[in-house]
Amino acid sequence: MDLSTLAAFALFVAVMTGTPGPGNLTFMAIGATSGYRTAFPVIVASQLGSLVLNLCVAFGLGQVMAEGGPLVTVFKVLSMTYMAYLAWRIVSLSIKPKGDVRLPSFWEGILIHPLSPKTWAMSLVAFTTFFAGNGLALGENAALLTGGLLIGGTIAHSIWALVGVSILAVLGDGPLLRATTITMAGGMLAATAWAMLL
């Protein structure tokens, strides 16, 4: 892989991981309602899930998903169901008293990317555009794909969570924060539905 291709991949990662999607909106909402300390373990978990997804794409599952069929239909149902559950969890953080709601867990974070249509699309496009047929061994391509998306995802999710913390500092823990959190949860569902149509 030459330097210009690597630079193009880095730009792709920065744009794709930095734009709104289920993961980024989730972490902004967690940051806004519970702070960065609460968001960070879930960010780590989400990146472990992303790592597994990207390895699966690199080793052939991406091609199976790209061909469509019953597996993709099952994925879409699971994806929308999980994102609806996640949206409800995010809204619960802002409308229930602090002691009455369980914070998002490590295990809930692991499923964010494997069930995110945006992440699947991003991984498939990255692999086919920058790594397919480039002359490197499959293991090398898998390492570059997963490493690049892991770094980009961790940075982007952290930035979005810190934006959420800033929202909390500005709005305080009241009706405006609740309205903002509900809007973010709705945005996450809309982003998921939109990604399914692409």
Question: What are these language model-derived features?
Answer:
Residues 3-70, 125-145, 149:
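Juxtamembrane transmembrane-helix termini in multi-pass membrane transport proteins
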Residues 54-58, 115-128, 186-198:
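Hydrophobic alpha-helical transmembrane segments in multi-pass integral membrane proteins
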Residues 23, 49-61, 83-86, 120, ...:
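Alpha-helical transmembrane segments and their lipid-water interface positions
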Residues 141-165:
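Hydrophobic alpha-helical transmembrane segments of multi-pass membrane transport proteins
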Residues 92-105:
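Flexible cytoplasmic inter-helical loops of multi-pass small-molecule transporters
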Residues 14-15, 48, 84, 110, ...:
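Hydrophobic residues within the alpha-helical transmembrane core of Major Facilitator Superfamily
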Residues 66-95, 150, 156-160, 170-198:
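Selective transmembrane alpha-helices of multi-pass membrane proteins
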